[in-house]
């Protein structure tokens, strides 16, 4: 039986986790949620926790101090976050942080491959894990992979403030479906993509670029207002 497998940078806890669990449990099909547990440890062997919850399985693991410093605080927080929040003047990038970013995405993929089954549908959440599908596919994974941007997609001028922007765009093409919250965001992405690689529009809303075929979709994100107050 196929599952929905959600891979996210960091898992929530407490009330948020319970709420998310109820949402997953309401689905007819089982699921798997994989991500960083929020802990940072300085041990060579870092345990991977596997738990069964109502309606889905949960796989979590800690980061090393170096992973947290270079990936989370470095490339993501000091680099990608300012660009994706329209504050490029605050962005700081180094080759070492980018290397850690790619390496940690490979680690996410390594752990995911140990738990994925044929037919599982993989959904990856946001820009901390942009290259994750590439790491999965390069290990031979054949499962369908989707990626969702919950933030506005940056303009080409903003994106070019990232030294590795071309590599990041190329890594997105390993996804079978790329989701956005608005049509404007999708159009901005396609405009940025066409500036880097030739595009070919195929039947059934498929797109071909840099040797990959993928689709895009619009999935407006919202909240349950009753849970706010």
What is each PLM-predicted segment?
Residues 1-229:
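Catalytic cores of carbohydrate-active enzymes across secretory and cytosolic contexts
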């Amino acid at each position: 039986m196929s599952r929905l497998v959600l891979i996210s940078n960091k898992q929530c806890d407490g009330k948020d986790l319970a709420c998310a669990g109820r949402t997953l449990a309401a689905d007819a099909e089982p699921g798997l949620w994989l991500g960083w547990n929020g802990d940072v440890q300085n041990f060579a062997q870092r345990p991977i926790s596997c738990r069964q919850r109502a309606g889905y399985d949960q796989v979590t693991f800690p980061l090393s101090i170096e992973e947290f410093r270079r990936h989370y605080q470095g490339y993501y927080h000091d680099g990608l976050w300012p660009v994706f929040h329209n504050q490029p003047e605050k962005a700081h990038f180094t080759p070492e942080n980018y290397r850690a970013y790619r390496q940690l995405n490979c680690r996410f993929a390594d752990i995911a491959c140990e738990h994925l089954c044929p037919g599982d549908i993989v959904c990856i959440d946001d820009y901390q894990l942009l290259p994750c599908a590439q790491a999965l596919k390069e290990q031979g994974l054949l499962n369908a992979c989707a990626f969702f941007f919950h933030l506005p997609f940056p303009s080409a001028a903003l994106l070019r403030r990232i030294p590795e922007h071309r590599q990041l765009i190329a890594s997105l093409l390993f996804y079978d479906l790329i989701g956005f919250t608005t049509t404007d965001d999708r159009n901005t992405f396609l405009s940025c993509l066409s500036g880097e690689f030739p595009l070919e529009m195929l039947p059934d809303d498929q797109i071909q670029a840099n040797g990959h075929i993928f689709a895009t979709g619009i999935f407006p994100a919202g909240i349950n207002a009753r849970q706010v107050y």
